[in-house]
Amino acid sequence: MINDLKKDSEQRMLKTLESLEQGFAKVRTGRAHPSILNGVMVPYYGSDVPLNQVANVGVEDSRTLIVQPFERTMVAAIDKAIRESDLGLNPITADSIRVPLPALTEETRRDMQKIARSEAENAKVAIRNIRRDVLGDIKALLKEKEISEDDERRAGDDIQKITDKYVAEVDKRLAAKEAELMKV
């Protein structure tokens, strides 16, 4: 029973780390990467769909993305969606769309660091919330006399160790992302 709770908490914390990586992927580092445009939604036959469902997104060079729509009629809509996204990008339109990434200034890098720190803090909060939920479940087992106080204390210590491990992993990934952001 306690082992199931531990496994469940670890799986949920692992999903939180995966979510953190997705959040970090949205933070621009100055190098072109197709995931930068993952959050862009394009109007397509009356509904908004992710850009990667209506176009191929690739890297032309280190500072330029190339977007090749599946349908030529989508070029204007994709161009508009990229311009209106909060990424601060200005695409160049022809048959395909070239998206040059402006060089990051020191100020922009600092802003990106703040965003990365915010993502990391959100991940830590999520991990701590998972810990709180699991500790609550363990206390409920103790109240129902399904486990002893010693088992409850031991399980609480184990959950804390798991939590510390994942919080340290978040810190490690944040440090790596910050180093990547500050690299010119």
From Swiss-Prot:
Q: What task does this protein carry out? A: Responsible for the release of ribosomes from messenger RNA at the termination of protein biosynthesis. May increase the efficiency of translation by recycling ribosomes from one round of translation to another.
Q: What name is this protein filed under?
A: Ribosome-recycling factor
Family recorded in the similarity comment? Belongs to the RRF family.
CDD domains for this protein: RRF (cd00520)
Q: Supply the HAMAP family for this chain.
A: RRF
Pfam families in the record: RRF
* InterPro entries linked: Ribosome_recyc_fac (IPR002661), Ribosome_recyc_fac_dom (IPR023584), RRF_sf (IPR036191)
The compartments listed are: Cytoplasm
Origin organism is Acinetobacter baumannii (strain ATCC 17978 / DSM 105126 / CIP 53.77 / LMG 1025 / NCDC KC755 / 5377)
Question: Main site of residence?
Answer: cytoplasm
Instruction: Tell me yes or no: is Magnesium among this UniProt entry's keywords.
Output: no
Lineage, broadest ranks: Bacteria, Pseudomonadati, Pseudomonadota, Gammaproteobacteria, Moraxellales
Sorted keywords for this record are: Cytoplasm, Protein biosynthesis
Question: Which molecular-function annotation in GO is an example for this chain?
Answer: ribosomal large subunit binding
